[in-house]
């Protein structure tokens, strides 16, 4: 049997990331054969992975990578079982290594099948499952290209990408701010104009059903009833609807005894409140129609207009 030296153990540890004792045991079992020892460690990983395949892996790290000319970005989540492992330096380093490789692929399946120092990425994850002792897998995987792409990562839990139409002077600031918005608030589409009318109607019906059910219970308990909405998107607010809202506001002011000469100062605010109260779907799911988190006096779309560019895409991944 070959003599196993500390240098041999350290070399295997550097190659696989396995613990010192695991590396020594593998080298002893392999009688000093380095390649065989690596295979032994991988087989251990496969056994651990098989035993933990049904475990929930909702912890981990969300990471991002942008290429040198800011025209392409990647975000992934590397998932594990516990927050303790998710915060481990070696684990986060692996996540960052993986996302730098991920940028060269269009989807997660291609990436998992790609080479990682002689084995596939999928096999590397199995290997690391054996090393760490927890289920390790790629969760979220998103790629985004554009004239300029920027990113934002929130405490290694959520990552977002934003692409804009031109590489302007303040592109990094804009894309980071919008990515922060995407990470914090989420969004399904860019604008309310992208909503299918049938989707809006189905959402409205679903929300009305929930509110009416809640109101039945509130009425039974003698509590205040919730308002049942007629509209939830600006796409439903026709000029006639807006005009009627203005007329209703005038009637309200008249009933309150407000002098007509001050109505022009009050009406815009009331109409704007009507619009805000009846566009909840837009505020939840349409990025440009959300209140900007860094200045809620304006919409994201208003903030973006100040840069004279357009948002051409956005992506988001999150743990859990």
Curated annotation (Swiss-Prot):
The record's listing under InterPro entries reads: EF-Ts_dimer_sf, Transl_elong_EFTs/EF1B, Transl_elong_EFTs/EF1B_dimer, Transl_elong_Ts_CS, UBA-like_sf
PROSITE patterns, alphabetically? EF_TS_1 (PS01126)
UniProt-listed Pfam families: EF_TS
Annotated S-S bridges? none
Q: Give the transmembrane ranges.
A: none
Query: What is the purpose of this protein?
Result: Associates with the EF-Tu.GDP complex and induces the exchange of GDP to GTP. It remains bound to the aminoacyl-tRNA.EF-Tu.GTP complex up to the GTP hydrolysis stage on the ribosome.
Q: What is this protein called?
A: Elongation factor Ts
State the organism of origin: Flavobacterium johnsoniae (strain ATCC 17061 / DSM 2064 / JCM 8514 / BCRC 14874 / CCUG 350202 / NBRC 14942 / NCIMB 11054 / UW101)
């Amino acid at each position: 049997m070959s003599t196993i030296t500390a240098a041999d153990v350290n070399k295997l540890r550097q190659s696989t990331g396995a613990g010192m004792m695991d590396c020594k045991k593998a080298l002893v079992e392999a009688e000093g054969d380095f390649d065989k020892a690596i295979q032994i460690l991988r087989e251990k990983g496969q056994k651990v992975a098989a035993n933990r395949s049904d475990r929930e892996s909702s912890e981990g790290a969300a990471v991002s990578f942008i290429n040198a000319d800011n025209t392409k970005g990647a975000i992934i989540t590397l998932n594990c079982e516990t927050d303790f492992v998710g915060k481990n330096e070696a684990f986060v380093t692996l996540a960052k290594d993986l996302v730098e490789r991920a940028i060269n692929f269009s989807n997660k399946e291609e990436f998992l099948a790609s080479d990682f120092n002689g084995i596939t990425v999928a096999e590397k994850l199995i290997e690391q499952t054996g090393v760490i002792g927890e289920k390790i897998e790629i969760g979220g995987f998103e790629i985004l290209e554009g004239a300029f792409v920027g990113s934002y990562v929130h405490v290694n839990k959520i990552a977002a990408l934003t692409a804009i139409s031109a590489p302007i002077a303040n592109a990094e600031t804009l894309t980071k701010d919008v990515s922060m918005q995407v990470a914090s608030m989420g969004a399904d589409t860019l604008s309310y104009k992208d909503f299918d009318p049938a989707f809006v109607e189905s959402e409205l019906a679903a929300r009305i059903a929930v509110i009416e059910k809640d109101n039945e219970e509130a009425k039974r308990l003698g509590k205040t009833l919730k308002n049942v909405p007629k509209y939830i998107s600006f796409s439903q607010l026709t000029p006639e609807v807006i005009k009627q809202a203005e007329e209703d506001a005038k009637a309200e002011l008249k009933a309150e005894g407000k002098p007509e000469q001050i109505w022009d100062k009050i009406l815009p605010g009331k109409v704007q409140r009507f619009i805000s109260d009846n566009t909840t779907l837009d505020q939840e799911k349409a990025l440009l129609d959300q209140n900007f988190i860094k200045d809620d006096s304006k919409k994201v779309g208003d903030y973006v207009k100040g840069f004279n560019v357009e948002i051409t895409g956005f992506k988001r991944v999150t743990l859990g």
